[in-house]
């Protein structure tokens, strides 16, 4: 496990952060998230990672091993345990979690993102070709869109929430996920989404 944050609170009982970038290593693969609430309880050796409701914190956990975007409310892992539990928040009325393959295509999302000036996913893909990479400063993308960073920030949060990009607001960097390119190019692929309920 790797965790990174601008601010960790460390005391005798726990290690915590309101916003941490995390990476679970699974052999050559990983489960990652750009900005979860991080809490490690020392007494029970248990780590709880909680997604937020909006912006970067609402982004899915990306599972490169199973090639899934995962949308549980929280992930709970006891050190040394081979199992990671997905659980709802205490008192949560919604006990559903969603897992979507990287090739899953939702026409409603695509249409929702499409505006008078076209679809931002297509624009970002074209920008990566021109830029020569899939990670870049947010200022470069804003210039390509002919807007200010502030003008496109809401869009970046929204695309992060959908799992198309990771926007690191602290470092002002954008990295495109495989899902962005799949969404544009693989509409004819087999699409799979797995809604589930916590037990």
Where are these regions (language model features)?
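Beta-strand-dominated lipid-handling architectures at cellular/organellar boundaries
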Residues: 1-62, 67-69, 74-88, 92-94, ...
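Secondary-structure transition motifs
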Residues: 91-120
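Short amphipathic alpha-helical interface segments
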Residues: 111-145
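Basic amphipathic alpha-helical segments that dock to polyanions
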Residues: 141, 155-162
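A short, conserved structural fragment
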Residues: 160-170
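Accessory beta->alpha helical hairpin/"wing" motif in late/C-terminal subdomains of nucleic-acid enzymes
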Residues: 169-188
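Single conserved hydrophobic/aromatic residue that forms the stacking wall/gate
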Residues: 191-198
């Amino acid at each position: 496990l790797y965790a990174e944050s601008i601010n960790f609170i460390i005391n005798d009982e726990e290690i915590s952060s309101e916003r941490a970038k995390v990476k679970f290593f699974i052999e050559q693969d990983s489960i990652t998230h750009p900005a979860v609430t991080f809490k490690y309880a020392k007494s029970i050796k248990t780590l709880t990672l909680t997604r937020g409701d909006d912006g970067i914190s609402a982004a899915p956990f990306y599972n490169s091993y199973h090639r899934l975007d995962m949308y549980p409310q929280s992930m709970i892992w006891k050190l040394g345990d081979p199992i990671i539990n997905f659980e709802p928040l205490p008192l949560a009325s919604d006990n559903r979690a969603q897992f979507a393959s990287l090739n899953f295509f939702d026409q409603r999302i695509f249409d929702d993102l499409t505006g008078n000036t076209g679809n931002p996913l297509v624009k970002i893909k074209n920008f990566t070709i021109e830029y020569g990479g899939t990670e870049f400063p947010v200022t470069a993308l804003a210039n390509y869109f002919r807007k200010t960073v502030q003008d496109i920030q809401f869009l970046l949060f929204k695309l992060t929430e959908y799992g198309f990009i990771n926007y690191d607001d602290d470092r002002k960097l954008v990295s495109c996920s495989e899902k962005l390119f799949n969404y544009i190019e693989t509409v004819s692929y087999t699409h799979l989404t797995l809604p589930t309920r916590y037990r």
